[in-house]
UniProtKB/Swiss-Prot annotation:
<dbReference type="GO" id="GO:0097470">
    <property type="term" value="C:ribbon synapse"/>
</dbReference>
<comment type="similarity">
    <text>Belongs to the D-isomer specific 2-hydroxyacid dehydrogenase family.</text>
</comment>
<feature type="modified residue" description="Asymmetric dimethylarginine">
    <location>
        <position position="22"/>
    </location>
</feature>
<feature type="binding site">
    <location>
        <begin position="243"/>
        <end position="249"/>
    </location>
    <ligand>
        <name>NAD(+)</name>
    </ligand>
</feature>
<keyword id="KW-0539">Nucleus</keyword>
<dbReference type="GO" id="GO:0098684">
    <property type="term" value="C:photoreceptor ribbon synapse"/>
</dbReference>
<dbReference type="InterPro" id="IPR029753">
    <property type="entry name" value="D-isomer_DH_CS"/>
</dbReference>
<dbReference type="GO" id="GO:0051287">
    <property type="term" value="F:NAD binding"/>
</dbReference>
<feature type="binding site">
    <location>
        <position position="296"/>
    </location>
    <ligand>
        <name>NAD(+)</name>
    </ligand>
</feature>
<feature type="binding site">
    <location>
        <begin position="321"/>
        <end position="324"/>
    </location>
    <ligand>
        <name>NAD(+)</name>
    </ligand>
</feature>
<dbReference type="GO" id="GO:0001222">
    <property type="term" value="F:transcription corepressor binding"/>
</dbReference>
<dbReference type="GO" id="GO:0044877">
    <property type="term" value="F:protein-containing complex binding"/>
</dbReference>
<dbReference type="GO" id="GO:0017053">
    <property type="term" value="C:transcription repressor complex"/>
</dbReference>
<dbReference type="GO" id="GO:0098982">
    <property type="term" value="C:GABA-ergic synapse"/>
</dbReference>
<feature type="binding site">
    <location>
        <position position="106"/>
    </location>
    <ligand>
        <name>NAD(+)</name>
    </ligand>
</feature>
<dbReference type="GO" id="GO:0098978">
    <property type="term" value="C:glutamatergic synapse"/>
</dbReference>
<dbReference type="InterPro" id="IPR051638">
    <property type="entry name" value="CTBP_dehydrogenase"/>
</dbReference>
Amino acid sequence: MALVDKHKVKRQRLDRICEGIRPQIMNGPLHPRPLVALLDGRDCTVEMPILKDLATVAFCDAQSTQEIHEKVLNEAVGAMMYHTITLTREDLEKFKALRVIVRIGSGYDNVDIKAAGELGIAVCNIPSAAVEETADSTVCHILNLYRRNTWLYQALREGTRVQSVEQIREVASGAARIRGETLGLIGFGRTGQAVAVRAKAFGFSVIFYDPYLQDGIERSLGVQRVYTLQDLLYQSDCVSLHCNLNEHNHHLINDFTIKQMRQGAFLVNAARGGLVDEKALAQALKEGRIRGAALDVHESEPFSFAQGPLKDAPNLICTPHTAWYSEQASLEMREAAATEIRRAITGRIPESLRNCVNKEFFVTSTPWSVIDQQAIHPELNGATYRYPPGIVGVAPGGLPPAMEGIIPGGIPVTHNLPTVAHPSQAPSPNQPTKHGDNREHPNEQ
């Protein structure tokens, strides 16, 4: 009776340790086809040809996990998503088999990547997605603020008569020359650099602030680097945001930083809505401290002028988070996302993934020393294997690759293969010994 209780305690201890470990995606003739889901869309025509030979692809068209089908929550091993759905820790815990999420785009602030990593879910993005489109849209917004094209168009649509010089002065009030103006870029990654190249062609002097970037890039692009945000805000006639959103830079543009900007400067944001405190921006626009602003992203999306702090703000251009979009960019992003899912299925997570953003939080296995070896299936315990318990390591002549994976809780594997033959005696003295071989019996010191 005492022996039974002892084994029961060991089993419970192993179950607790392995509770957070998710298996690698099982792929092959001995396993059912893995399920991959597009969470917040309904068109899978691009993804299907890339994945159809090894996975079942489904769509959910959901805006929250409450709208996701139960089969996807229980069985999906891979998920693709745009920016229109948010996954918190609570949401991620609802997925029972999920191993990889690919964000179809560059930003991933709508996924709790730390919680995902701790749950054994890799999160990937497409960092080169729509760089040209976003840069082009940003420059369009900048030109619009300087040349007032949007307001001139609106005046004509409203029936304003523009004929005399006085009428032109009135309707085009605020239009400014670009040459010699200073454009300040906060964040100087792919998109920031693309904006700099375009802006220089229009006559801007370009400066940037990016505390994470190594020195030297400014020389190759002929721009100037500043080393504090305050310096950038003070020197810039137009400020454009090109950084990811995180807990450190939320509301980077707020009442305090706006007061450090030049009187009458412009502000452009095609990065993330949470970077700008919209209440502070609205007040600055009304007071004229900021001459004009152009926003493609907003704190609350989908954006509406009918509500929120910006509804009465003057000199404001807003677009509905579309700076990234072109037919070509959309196609490339979807192909890249499906290809990353394919890497996850055919390779190992996260090692095989090209753009995993949460490796530092990732939990893949438990150290050997904390798991009782006797709970491991006998065939997988012995001289041939030395891997963390629960992970089936494949040695020459052992299990086929299709059987490689994690066995939660040490559940026995059922297969028709012969058992692994272990040496019954020590090797011959004449047999060479490989130094550093890690495959000795785990109990041997």
